[in-house]
Amino acid sequence: MIEGVSVKELRSNLDKVGLTLDIWGDENPPGPLCASSCRMLFPGMLEAWVSRREAAERITCLEGTIKLVLCDRREGSPTRDDVMELFLGEYRFREVTVPPGVLRGWKAVGGRALVFLALEGGGADALFLTPEEAGVPYDWDIVMQ
């Protein structure tokens, strides 16, 4: 596990009218001065690599399945250069918090589009890197077995 990354299982309730998913409760409210976005990613598409300079990013997949890959590029971190792969989505609702300085990429896996929320804290300026600039030792073509 990369230092500073947290993975929280989210509580869901399925009843006769639908599904309720508790995302940001009293114990984990979104912070002040934050930006949020709801995104859709088409099947097989990926976006990599991005790092937040000053703020953490919280990611929750609402529909479909996302492969989230993280790489620690922080100077002095005990987990520097570690790579972490997570799958989240409608079969396993989770919120992943990615600290500043950790690169992240994501890919829509499965046969349909995915919908996810991203919440960035204040100062959410992003650094976008090409695969060559990022130099992350990860093969996106590897599939979950």
Q: What are these model-derived regions, one by one?
A:
Residues 1-92, 111-145:
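Non-catalytic, conserved peripheral segments adjacent to functional cores
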Residues 96, 104-109, 117:
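Short beta-strand His + acidic residue motifs that chelate non-heme Fe in jelly-roll/DSBH
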